[in-house]
Amino acid sequence: MSEEISPNDRKFITNLLTQKNQESLLLSIGDKISKKKNKKPSKRIILITKNRIFFLKPSQNKVKKDIHLLDIQEIKSSTSNEFTIVAKVDNKQFSYGLITNKTDEIINQIRVTFNHQFFGCPEESTFKCTDIKDSRLVEIEQKDLPCGGFVETYQSICDHLGVPPRDDICWDMTNIISSKNIRSFNIGEIELPTSAGDTIRCLLGALKYNNYFKSFNFNNYTFNKEQFGYLAEVLKCNSTVEDLSLNNVGLKHDTMPIIATALSSNKNLALTAIDISNNQIEDKGMTAFSSYVASSLRGIASLDVSNTNCNKAGISVLTNALKKNIKMSSTLSYLNLSGNKMEADGSAGLSSFLASPNTLKTLNISNTTPSMETIVGALVIGCAELKTIDISDNKLTKKEVPHLVRFIGASSTLKHFNLSGTKVPVENLKELVVAITSNIYLQDVVLDLKNNDLGIAGARMLASLATDKLSNVIYLDVSENDFGDEGVSVICDGFVGNSTIKKLILNGNFKQSKTKSRPSAIESVISLLESECPLETLHMTVGNSKSPLKADILSLIYSLATNSSLLELDISGHQMGPKGAIGLGKALQTNKTLHTLIWDDNLTTAIGFAGFQVGLERNLTLKNMPTPLNDIIQCHREPKFQQIWKEIDSCINRNQSPTRAFEGNGGNSIGATNLSFLASGQQQGVEKLLNKIKSIGRKVTDPNNILIVKDAESTEKVIGGIHLIKESIHASLEMELNQKLKDFVQVVNDVINAKKNEMTQQILESMQNTFQSMDGPTIKRLATTIQYGSKDVDEQQIHSTLVKGAGAELSSRAHECFISALDIASDYTYEKITIGLDSVFKDLILEESQAQNEASGATPIPDSPVPTRSPQPTSPPITPQPTPTTNVPPVTAPRTGAAAPLKPANPPPVSTTTTPPVSTTPKPTQPVSKFGAKLSANSAVAEAIARNMGGGAPPIRKPVAPEPEPEPVTPTKDVTPLKSKPVVAPRSTPTTSTPTKTPVKKPSGPSVPGSLSDAPESDSAELTHVTASRPHIASKRKPPTRRPRPPTEN
């Protein structure tokens, strides 16, 4: 009957739709059902849109009735020629009916439209269809709408309330939330105006009829009492939400009952996680909430009621409700009661729940003043699955510690133990730590001990347990414990031998007053990083101590250049200035493991950032670096800073992307080795030994020693050669890998196209078998359209993914393997060459000593400027003790000057078979052709040689201040009296008949600092870079060789 609508009416309808921003879904005309039986029926036009139903009187251009879909309560229709709509608008109920032969079409259109606009509306909230046979009702097809129709529902709610819908909310829901399959509704993602009452009401109204979201997050938005009522309506209807977070939303003792009542009334509620923390609920509000907890049909898995200003009464009611609900023992896994005052009554209520068998995995009772004895006893009985316990900020007494020790000993699942702020005495803390380490069932434990004022005593206690006791702790936080320089040094030295710790937090432990132990403390940190300890993360910020290390931290920065274990470093707040930033840049050029660096608040200037940027350009492993905002704020106005920071950010983005420099790099391989820097430390050691050998002034005659010296002189060439071999092999690998991946690009492209064709064929077959109306030509046209109209995989994209992406990662991993093999070969070579040169040096020293002894014992010394006198009968020469390798006493050294005895005319020859050779080390300025020092203390000298030169493993750490070493000089004929000095004697060797050469047993390792092998090679000043050699220990990860730290200034 739409043909009976006049053009004038149609024009009015068009204007109405434009004004209401609606579109027509159905337009018809009929006779109005009048309540008066004798009254003549009048015509009415019915217009159905997405949100409303309009009834208009023809030729009057006036809307007689306007009904929103949500206002409809019932539709009655006993016959297919008439229907009546019962609605309620502004709390006034009315009915409106029409007589029309399109009754069924109109009813079904209203049903379909309502279902489309309110897709998730529960059945009890929809209008009723009364007296309508099922045969008249069509089946409604369900559509897959973004976010379960949230946008349509939101727009309809806005229309119902007369509020303009926000296009940004609709766009976000359609293009972000839905496309990313995000099931959490977060109010923080929506930009709310200052007065957001209408927006919140519309959003909550849409959530009431939506089943898409499974989590509601309203954190930090303050609701008023009216808005809590709207939220309660949502919770009464929603049947899909599982996680409700109301952290800091303004809940109070008078609004909490509104929410609790709504939760209790919804029998279909699927809620399993509730967060009502940081609200002033108090005991009264907690009592109302506990009524829901006790009656929850499904139980609760996670419950957070922290900082709700509840006292023992409120906590007691809540814990009793947990025990009353039988579902809680099998569902509750997370319970947070922190920030409330439990005291004895609350502790008793909690223990009554914990004592029963339960599935609790995390318990947080920090800052609750609990009765530890009561709670711990319940933990031992019922909490067999507890993994995390937080008792921080509760002052522990000596009486309570044994109860915790008992719980730790009985646990087999504990992973995280938080004791921060408990001020537990050191001796009692040791009991707890020992209990953790003694429990063989506990593994990978996270131990938080920060802010306990442990001091130096606590540091010593932890250090004493670190090596062999803390075998199951992987994370240790000892921040803000007032260790000071000495304590930091002690705790780092203690963990050198630990084999499990992976993350160590030392924030805020340096005191404001710098002590003499500061360099030693920093050196201890460096030694910890270079040791066998598997430490991967180190945080050493200034913390709350406000005592920055400034320039003292530079040595730690420089040590990163050769560190091969640390993955994450935080040194924020130490005010190291631009010098530290430049040092970081230089260290990053050779560091190949650090991937996270945090270094804000270090007084870094634009010059410092520029130096850092230079190093970062040559580093491919640093991927995470939080923006140092404090330093940027201070220097963002400096010239060229913006460009510098853009380049730094570009380098970080490059490292985060897998498509790094792989092909077309002009021969600059990934992570190319800086040969001169890597080899300088060990190579200098070899050159130093060669110079010492030359300084003796004696020619090497032994064939084996000649080969050793020649090999040593070729070391630099050989090491350089193997580095070039590595670079060549890596370059060839990149070429081969590049070619293989390029060939594989075509293979992948063919596979994708084949699968696409297979899918197309199956689609066509399915459609041809299903749709009888589609003939062969139609299917053929569809196949052609798919073939030429659908999107193909770009071969260039496959090339980029495989060659530049996967290829770069594979090349980088292979390069790491090559570097590892190269390091082993280099270290082995230098070790063997150093041992050989050390042996040659000792042989030459022995030969020189023998020659000097023979010369001093057989030939008179002419032109002696010192007069001689007869020996005193009361002062006989000192007879030395026999050495372990001979039974004949060694020859007594002759005296010079006034104390020298008279020489016989024919001095007896010196027997080389019974007298071991003796050498001395005179002062550099004194001739040594005639020895005035006593040479009789051979046993002590031999012991010194065995200690300093005898092939033992070198020390792990380089000493802070090495002792000065004597310089050897060439013997001359002029002799002056010598003062008594430590005498360097040869090692004990088997006697031979050859007077000029004594076979020497080769030492088993390089010398230690302070031995003869560490003497300077000439009278010139000692080398600027001195690197202590490191032992070669067979282990999973070999500690790196200490190399010279890069200087930061000339």
From Swiss-Prot:
Residues 1-179 are annotated as: Required for interaction with capping protein. Residues 884-903, 911-929, 988-1011 have a biased composition (Low complexity). Residues 851-931, 945-1050 are annotated as: Disordered. Disruption phenotype: Cells exhibit a striking defect in the formation of dorsal, cup-like, macropinocytic structures, a concomitant reduction in the rate of fluid phase pinocytosis, a significant decrease in the efficiency of chemotactic aggregation, and a decrease in cellular F-actin content. A motif (PXXP motif) lies at residues 959-963, 968-971. SUPFAM superfamilies: RNI-like. Keywords: Cell projection, Leucine-rich repeat, Repeat. Pfam families: Carm_PH (PF17888), LRR_6 (PF13516). LRR repeats lie at residues 243-266, 268-291, 329-352, 383-409, 411-436, 442-464, 470-493, 563-590. It is found in: Cell projection, Pseudopodium. GO terms for cellular component: actin cytoskeleton; cell leading edge; lamellipodium; leading edge of lamellipodium; macropinocytic cup; phagocytic vesicle; plasma membrane; pseudopodium. GO terms for biological process: cell migration; regulation of Arp2/3 complex-mediated actin nucleation. The keyword Repeat applies. Induction: Down-regulated by Pseudomonas aeruginosa, PAO1 strain and PA14 strain infection. Serves as the scaffold for the assembly of a complex that links key players in the nucleation and termination of actin filament assembly with a ubiquitous barbed end-directed motor. This complex is composed of at least capping proteins (acpA and acpB), the Arp2/3 complex, type I myosins (myoB and myoC) and carmil. It has at least a modest ability to activate Arp2/3-dependent actin nucleation. CARMIL localizes along with the Arp2/3 complex, myoB, and myoC in the leading edge of cells and it plays a significant role in the structure and function of these actin-rich cellular extensions. Belongs to the CARMIL family. This is Protein CARMIL. It comes from Dictyostelium discoideum (Social amoeba).
